[in-house]
Amino acid sequence: LHVVLCIDRAGIVGNDGATHHGLFDMAYLRPIPNMSICAPRVAEDLRDMMTLAQGLDGPVAIRYPRGRSVLAERHTPVEYGKGICLQEGKDLAVLSIGAIGNTVQTALQSLPNGAEVGHYDMRWLKPMDDSLLHEIGKRYKTLITVEDGEVCGGLGSAVLEWMADHAYTPRVIRLGVQDRFVEHGSTAELNHMLALDAEGIAKTISENCHS
């Protein structure tokens, strides 16, 4: 059945209340056969994904957060099942999906100039970009996955599974919501509490840059 699910209020939604957070959708949609799942980082991605989804077979889920979108300085058109490299690194790479990738970019800008950290916007949780993941698996010793949802079954789990299936052995650190319900609060307060703001992400990167 070809249906396009536009999942609004994905991730932490802030003042809408504790029952409105969209934290579990990636984890429960990923096991469904023939399901495609994507998340835009910037406004242009969302436009491309909605256009692309109309021509796909099977169900497609496009997840995006509450609030205003970010416009891209330079936009790479979205391709089905393909991620992009936003920044190349040396020993450590951050893999993100969706709008939280903009927070990762802010975090990276706060690091010392000598930090050589890669950043990849995966764009698609399912299917995953095999060629990009092979490149990442060969190149990096440490990976940090960042997602605005439950880490159990989400991007972090998917990356761990893929690396194990293809005999790569990087250390994988998963940032996201750790097996819990999240209370009411502003997005800034909650992301800070979960270490998913720029400060928290930068701290995790710094602690693992030379491990």
State where each predicted segment sits.
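A glycine-rich helix N-cap at a beta->alpha junction
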Residues: 1-9, 28
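Thiamine diphosphate
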Residues: 6-7, 12-22, 55-211
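Internal gly/pro-rich beta-alpha loop/helix module
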Residues: 15-33, 39, 43-54
